[in-house]
C-alpha cells in the first residue's frame, strides 16, 4: 500500500474511532465538522411549566450535545400560544433547513400542514407536551394525558367522597392533551352518579378569565377542576390560603397553591425531564438512526401538602 493510501486509511480509522468514543454515530462527524441543528418552538415562557421544559433542554447533557454535534435554538411567539405566529416561525425554520423541529402539538390545520411540509423535506418532528394524532412518523415526549386525567378523577373521588358538583375548566379547544385528560377524568368518575361534571369551559390560558369563571361557577359548583396549569397558577397567586368559594380545588402543576393550602392537590408533571429527554432522544437518533420509542412518557404523580 502506498504511503498516501496508508495515510488516508489511518485518517478514516481515526475518524470512526472518534465517533464511537465520542458517542456519535459513524457517519456523523465529530462535533465542529457537522452540526445537527435543532429548533425548539415553545408556545409560552412562564414560571412553572414551559420555562422548566426549556431549562431541561438547555441544561441537559452538555457532553451529549458536544459529542453529537448538536446545536439547539429555542424560540417562542411574541404572543403566548399564538398559532399564526408559531406557523410563521415554523416556515422560517423550514426555509433555514434545520434538521429537527421540537414543537407542542395542536390541531390547527395550517399548523399541521406546515409541520407536514417540514416532515416531507426530511426534518425530524418531535412533539413535546402535546401529541398530534395521525401525524406521519414522529416522536412524542410528555405525559400520558389520558392516564393523568384518570388519576385526577380518582383523586377527585377521594377528596369528595364520591359526591360533588364540579366545574371543569380547560385551556383551549383543539389540544389533544387536554381532550385526553378530560376523557380520563370522565372515565374515572363514570360509575359515581353523585359526581356531576359540568360542561367544559375554556379560560384560553388567561388569568383574568380564570378568575371570572372561578366566581361565576361558585353559584352552582362546590368543586372546581382545572385540566391544565393556568387555572391553578392563577388561584395560587390570588389566594394564600383556602378561599371559601369552593370546598375542593384540583388542578395541574400549581405546586405553590398546594403548599399554601389554596388547592387540595395537583397532578405534577415532570416538565424538566421532558426537556432533558428531548436532548437524549435526539442523541439516540444521531447515534443509532432511530429513537428509543415512538412515544416517551414522562412520569406524573399526585401532590398534596402532605407529600410535597
What is each of the regions a protein language model found here?
Residues 2-11:
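Bacterial N-terminal signal peptides that target proteins for export
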Residues 13, 25, 34, 169, ...:
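Hinge/cleft segment of the Venus flytrap/periplasmic-binding protein
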Residues 19-23:
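C-terminal motif of bacterial Sec signal peptides marking the signal peptidase cleavage site
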Residues 31, 86, 141-166, 207-211, ...:
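Hydrophobic alpha-helical segments within soluble ligand-binding/sensing domains
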Residues 39-60, 64, 73-87, 104-108, ...:
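Extracytoplasmic "Venus flytrap"
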Residues 63-79, 165-168, 189-205:
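Short beta-strand elements in bilobed, periplasmic/extracellular small-molecule ligand-binding domains
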Residues 91-94, 99-119, 185, 202-257:
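Hydrophobic alpha-helical
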Residues 109-147, 165, 253-264:
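Flexible loop/hinge segments that line or gate small-molecule binding clefts
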Amino acid at each position: 500500500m502506498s504511503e498516501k493510501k496508508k495515510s488516508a486509511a489511518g485518517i478514516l480509522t481515526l475518524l470512526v474511532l472518534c465517533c464511537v468514543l465520542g458517542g456519535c454515530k459513524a457517519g456523523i462527524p465529530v462535533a465542529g465538522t457537522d452540526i445537527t441543528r435543532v429548533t425548539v418552538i415553545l408556545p409560552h415562557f412562564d414560571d412553572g411549566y414551559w420555562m422548566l421544559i426549556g431549562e431541561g433542554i438547555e441544561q441537559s447533557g452538555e457532553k451529549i450535545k458536544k459529542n453529537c454535534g448538536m446545536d439547539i435554538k429555542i424560540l417562542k411567539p411574541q404572543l403566548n400560544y399564538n398559532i399564526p405566529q408559531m406557523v410563521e416561525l415554523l416556515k422560517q425554520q423550514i426555509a433555514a433547513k434545520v434538521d429537527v423541529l421540537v414543537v407542542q402539538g395542536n390541531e390547527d390545520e395550517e399548523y399541521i400542514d406546515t409541520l407536514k411540509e417540514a416532515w416531507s423535506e426530511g426534518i425530524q418532528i418531535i412533539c413535546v407536551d402535546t401529541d398530534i394524532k395521525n401525524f406521519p412518523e414522529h416522536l412524542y415526549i410528555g405525559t400520558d394525558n389520558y392516564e393523568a386525567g384518570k388519576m385526577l378523577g380518582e383523586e377527585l373521588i377521594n377528596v369528595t367522597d364520591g359526591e360533588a358538583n364540579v366545574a371543569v375548566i380547560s385551556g383551549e379547544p383543539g389540544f389533544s392533551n387536554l381532550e385526553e385528560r378530560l376523557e380520563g377524568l370522565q372515565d374515572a368518575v363514570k360509575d359515581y352518579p353523585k359526581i356531576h361534571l359540568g360542561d367544559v369551559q375554556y379560560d384560553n390560558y388567561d388569568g383574568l378569565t380564570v378568575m371570572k369563571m372561578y366566581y361565576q361557577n361558585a353559584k352552582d359548583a362546590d368543586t372546581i377542576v382545572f385540566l391544565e396549569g393556568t387555572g391553578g397558577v392563577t388561584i395560587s397567586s390570588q389566594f394564600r390560603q383556602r378561599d371559601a368559594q369552593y370546598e375542593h380545588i384540583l388542578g395541574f402543576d400549581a405546586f405553590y397553591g398546594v403548599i399554601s393550602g389554596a388547592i387540595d392537590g395537583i397532578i405534577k408533571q415532570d416538565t424538566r425531564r421532558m426537556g432533558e429527554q428531548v436532548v437524549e432522544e435526539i442523541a439516540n437518533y444521531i447515534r443509532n438512526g432511530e429513537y428509543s420509542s415512538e412515544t416517551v412518557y414522562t412520569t406524573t404523580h399526585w401532590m398534596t401538602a402532605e407529600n410535597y
